[in-house]
Design a protein with these regions (language model features):
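Nucleic-acid substrate recognition interfaces
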Residues: 1-592
């Protein structure tokens, strides 16, 4: 099983994932053919064992002390903890409690510890934010003063530079709800939240060939793969004989390269099917953080989700940025409106479910029998809410993939080596009200950036996040503060249109049109300050240098109209007929 690929100069290894469906299997001990239904049943037993034990490990160590020990990266002797979660848990002595009378191979216990360790490690970032919010609890949780914001930013993890304002507000609302219910502030995140679950899956990446192997099918290596994994014969295995190896055949998706190295998958059961999330490694061109000459930049919007264009950094002693004559726009009005409608329906159903749940709880407290009508209605509403949630999830996934493909395709067509975007995870339109801000927060910008970065990496294009402050405020050509109004022919103060008050400039354009030029110019002039965030594997420009930002004016691209050929001596023909004129008078006869 090969997990690494051979690389040449200028290439790096990218790990992607593809979802495959288990078709059939064969028991390697008895030679029995296993249908898909049998595979689903036996994989379900394995998933139940792993999930139950992993949840028990998470609940046992759901306290601030154990979370801090795991996040510190040091064991009791001061030695560094391994990067793999199951190794770190074993170093700390956190074992999985196997029930009496059950037999689980050591590699299955590895899977349990790996999934539990990943969940516990992922909690620490939220725990730090919650601790910072509680340590600097404001007088009014709904509105912090400037001094309170400064005190909070000083104690946030990673200098507070990458913590979105929406995350801070969510943690503040969570603590405020606890305070309202219990009359005191919580001690930490473990008091605010229940222990999280690990999900119904089996992560085989933590095991070796004693439990599972994956390889391409010998008969057709480009279309099919074979997973060999030990699955239990019964839901309560008691000996090693209850863990025979099973060869599972699956079809490799067509977008997986032929030279990609397959890695051990993650098993999931969805809608009566056994799904395999198969990671694969393949070589891609290396994306550089600096040295860019041609870039594309995009600005976020509401109905016009993305507005952007191409920018070029010229050479010479005084380099300057020129913007392309034409911009591009990704309009998703209908999709966003549909998502907004589904969100409203989901909120309405949630409110009805909460009312019915309150009524049912009230009847139980008074010793009354549950109302059959209420129970049936509650079940129907919960099913409908789940259905709408799945529709929203599918819609948002399709929107994120389409927007990512739009940006990467435009970058390829323009010959750009970098895509500049804003960090607007908590974008709010000031003075626009809660409804519009809710719609702005539901446009899956984080998923769009993730899909864009993944798709761009395959082509060696870097995706860099630029600080958003002031990109819509100043004119991209002279950096004078814009005057925003409603439309080109309506001077009333508004949002959509921007006009430069500088008489020598007078640039007038849409707000988003000016913003993407400022984003691209800021990225090109600050590209030497680009840094790689190791936690998210994202290129970031964390701070803006005022001198560079003031010099990052954008010049319009002017086509060369120099005369390159002599003037034609033959004059242009007049308005002549292409066919002979019809017989008869050329002027209409007089009336009457």
């Amino acid at each position: 099983m090969r997990r690494k690929v051979s690389l040449t100069e200028g290439e790096v290894q990218q790990v992607s994932a593809a979802c495959a469906r288990a078709m059939s299997g064969v028991d390697t001990v008895s030679g029995e053919y296993l249908s898909e239904a049998v595979l689903v049943e036996r994989a379900g037993w394995l998933t139940g064992l792993v999930t139950g034990l992993a949840d028990a490990v998470v609940r046992e160590h759901w306290n601030h002390g154990d979370l801090a020990r795991l996040a510190s990266g040091r064991d009791g002797a001061g030695a560094g903890l391994p990067a793999r979660a199951w190794m770190a848990l074993r170093r700390l002595g956190w074992s999985a409690p196997v029930p009496a009378g059950r037999y689980l191979p050591d590699r299955v216990v590895r899977v349990v510890q790996e999934q539990a360790g990943r969940v516990l490690r992922s909690v620490w970032w939220r725990a730090q934010i919650t601790a910072a919010v509680l340590a600097t609890w404001p007088a009014d949780p709904e509105r912090r003063t400037e001094a309170e914001w400064e005190a909070l930013r000083a104690v946030l993890p990673e200098d507070g530079g990458v913590v979105a304002g929406a995350v801070i507000k969510a943690r503040t609302r969570q603590a405020a709800a606890y305070l309202k219910k219990h009359g005191r502030l919580p001690a930490g995140i473990t008091a605010c939240e229940e222990a999280p679950g690990v999900g119904g899956q089996v992560v085989l990446a933590a095991v070796d060939k004693q439990l599972a192997t994956v390889e391409r099918c010998a008969e057709d290596p480009f279309r099919y793969g074979v997973l060999t994994v030990r699955l239990p014969l019964r839901p309560d295995p008691v000996s090693r004989k209850d863990w025979p190896a099973v060869r599972i055949r699956f079809r490799i998706p067509p977008h997986v390269p032929a030279d990609a190295a397959l890695c051990l998958p993650t098993l999931r059961i969805r809608d009566g099917r056994l799904l395999l999330d198969v990671p694969y490694a393949h070589p891609v061109p290396k994306a550089e953080s600096s040295g860019h000459r041609v870039a594309v930049a995009f600005d976020w919007g509401l109905n016009t989700l993305l507005t952007g264009g191409t920018l070029t950094l010229t050479g010479g002693a005084q380099p300057h940025v020129t913007a392309g004559a034409r911009s591009v726009a990704f309009r998703a009005d209908g999709v966003l409106a549909k998502g907004h409608r589904l969100r409203i329906q989901g909120e309405h159903l949630t409110a009805r479910i909460e009312r019915l749940s309150t009524l049912a709880a009230s009847r139980r407290e008074r010793g009354m029998r549950p109302d059959p009508w209420q129970s049936a209605k509650l079940a129907v509403l919960e099913v409908e809410r789940d259905r709408i949630s799945k529709r929203r999830s599918r819609l948002n996934t399709a929107l994120a993939k389409a927007a990512a493909r739009f940006m990467v395709d435009h970058a390829l067509a323009a010959g750009a080596t970098v895509i500049y975007l804003e960090d607007l995870r908590d974008m709010e339109a000031r003075g626009k009200g809660r409804t519009l801000n809710t719609r702005l927060s539901q446009t899956v910008r984080g998923a769009i950036v993730t899909h864009t970065r993944h798709r761009a990496t395959a082509h060696g294009i870097a995706v860099v996040i630029v600080p958003p402050r002031g990109t819509s405020k100043n004119c991209p050509r002279c950096l004078t503060t814009f005057r925003h109004h409603m439309a080109p022919d309506r001077s009333a103060t508004g949002w959509a249109w921007a006009t430069c008050p500088n008489e020598t400039c007078g640039y007038s354009t849409g707000r988003d049109q000016a913003a993407w030029q400022r984003i691209g110019a800021r990225g090109l002039t600050h590209q030497h300050t680009t840094r790689l965030d190791r936690t998210s594997d994202t290129y970031l420009i964390r701070t803006v240098i005022e001198a560079l930002d003031r010099a990052s004016t954008v010049l319009p691209e002017i086509s060369d109209r120099t005369k390159s050929a002599p003037t034609m001596k033959r004059p242009a023909p007049g308005q002549r007929r292409g066919v002979p004129a019809p017989p008869g008078p050329r002027t209409p006869p007089p009336a009457g």
